[in-house]
A protein has these predicted regions:
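Domain-level recognition of soluble alpha/beta enzyme cores
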Residues: 121-157
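Active-site-proximal alpha-helix that buttresses catalytic centers in soluble enzyme cores
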Residues: 2-81, 89, 113, 127, ...
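Residue-level preference for the first positions of well-ordered beta-strands
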Residues: 4, 103-105, 136
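Charged phosphate-binding loop/patch that engages nucleotide di/tri-phosphates or the phosphate backbone
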Residues: 152-169
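Glycine-rich phosphate-binding loop signature in dinucleotide/nucleotide-binding domains
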Residues: 44-46, 97-102
Length: 169
């Protein structure tokens, strides 16, 4: 059994029009959401062993902000193809993962990360999954090796909105 966490980056700032899309940082609201999501991840089993993030500033800040709350923070690897990635790009990365990894997180952007979640769970992009900023989808994949990942093989174990976490903690 493999576990895949799909985390959409936290709320980004639009206060700096001179910055490119890839350079936009998190907004204060986005930064505030990260410790709460980190606490949720700390309680999950199995723990996240590696994080692959889009190189966009807001995605890297999201990944690094979340792991500050973890007792055993995983390595965060910038993966340039994840910037505005589509389903085939996410799948290519998934197929390349080392088989010894049991739980991996991807930090990325819509619409691609949302589409990948739908493709894994429903076998197609259905438009029925909503990954808002700082929302986490936890998927179980009943596979032994990551290269076995196919359309519809995933089971959505939890969809965790950051607003719900704030209300609970």
């Amino acid at each position: 059994m493999k576990h895949l966490m799909l985390l959409r980056h936290a709320k980004s700032s639009w206060d700096h029009p001179e910055l490119s899309d890839e350079e936009r940082p998190l907004a204060p609201r986005g930064v505030k959401a990260l410790p709460l999501m980190g606490k949720v991840l700390e309680a999950m089993n199995p723990p996240v062993e590696r994080i692959y993030s889009s190189p966009a500033v807001r995605a890297i800040e999201t990944a690094k902000g979340v792991i500050r709350e973890l007792s055993k923070p995983p390595e965060v690897e910038e993966h340039p193809p994840l910037y505005l990635a589509d389903v085939p790009t996410f799948l290519q990365l998934t197929h390349s993962l080392a088989s010894e990894l049991e739980c991996v997180m991807f930090v990325g952007h819509n619409p691609g990360i949302e589409s990948f979640c739908e493709w894994l769970c429903f076998g197609r992009e259905s438009g029925s999954t909503s990954l808002r900023t700082a929302n986490l989808a936890w998927l179980e994949l009943p596979i032994e090796n990551w290269e076995e990942t196919t359309a519809g093989c995933g089971v959505l174990r939890s969809l965790i909105p950051s607003r719900l976490i704030k209300a609970l903690l």
